[in-house]
Amino acid sequence: MKDLSLHILDIIQNSISAGASLIQTEINENPEKDTYVLKIMDDGKGMNNETLQKAVDPFFTSRTTRKVGLGLPLLKQNAERTGGTFSLLSKQGEGTTVKAIFGYKHIDRLPLGDIGGVMALLSSANPALDFTYSHHSAEGDFEFDTREVKTELEGVSISHAEVNRFMKELINENIKSIEQS
């Protein structure tokens, strides 16, 4: 994948398939500690220990439509290529947490990409679900929560094209103002 927003899209699609109703995404930039942390948490059905152990194997997938599942293995590989780490925690009935720590200054760390477009797309395509996105850096913090957006819309669908465009611009402009990399 060419940027982190595409990894985020892939992981969140897994969360949606697992029946999650709330999916939280966090990014923490810390150049002083040379870390760029991506964390995605959901309240989906979770995984048993056997599935959890196999989840980062590219030749394992719970899907019946294909025989490989590259999302988690590619994210793990991209984190480790920068000197970072990857962890996957899950408990049946409670949800799953994916955490990738990248070397902040490493030349192979992927750019964030169009996170506003990804979050707006996911929110519009899944109006019954709730998404949060938080981004923290030394330059500031940004929080986005579809529950707040839905409240402000007063009956207008979060799937409306103008709302989608607004969410994308809101997220990307705020991230641009605080992103250090």
Residue ranges of model-derived segments:
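Flexible, glycine-/charge-rich segments associated with ATP-binding catalytic modules
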Residues: K2, N78-S181
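Short, hydrophobic/amphipathic alpha-helical packing segments
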Residues: I8-L9, G116
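Conserved beta-strand-loop-beta-strand hairpin that lines the nucleotide-binding pocket
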Residues: K2-H7, Q13-G69, P73-D108, Y133-F142
